[in-house]
């Protein structure tokens, strides 16, 4: 090969090297979890990993998951989101409303996929369900009628119930306000009295159940990250205090809850890789519609 041709080849390789390097890089996905560890998020994280596997991804080879944990201290979401953005990651996954809001504050350019954010339009996470319009899209597991439907089913199963305690996470005010408004509107139609019961941290649960003992006829627990993580303890406390419990997750029925009504958590989290796969292949969050699971499952204690 002539010297001039060799120089051209070397120059061409040098120009192409950054593109080749980027092509060989493993995409990084940063996840903002609300719980404190992989063990606590085992079910949902497992669903995410299985979803990637089903799409042909192998963790560590052609996809890298970077998990961060807020340990139910939602102020940590801001720092965790900033840390992931600084790496940077290729996609952010935000679990719960506070995580989605923290991710939105952290970046306007990195694609964000939220899970379980309540009313993403009201929160101004997206412009619309069909066309989000920004760098954010995702899956909301909070159907508008879900809180009302839980009270309706609870009334059918426990017809003597008049006073219902509605647990709300005071550390998650956006969710709390929505749940209180929905439950009180539904209660009026069902001739129920709903009493909002604030829970700030998991450590409050024992005190809360001791306080409400014999003062209410049943307890309803909405979709919320902290309550999901504490679902077994909530069910056990309800059983110990002999209070009928309506909750969102079927696993709680096995340990003391009377009724569970809601969408499948594993199916919801299993859809997260679908969004990420689309984004990594060039789709924009602005054009990926928000999903709202339509199938809800009812489970009754035997």
Residue ranges and their predicted role:
Residues 1-302:
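Short hydrophobic alpha-helices and adjacent helix-cap/hinge residues
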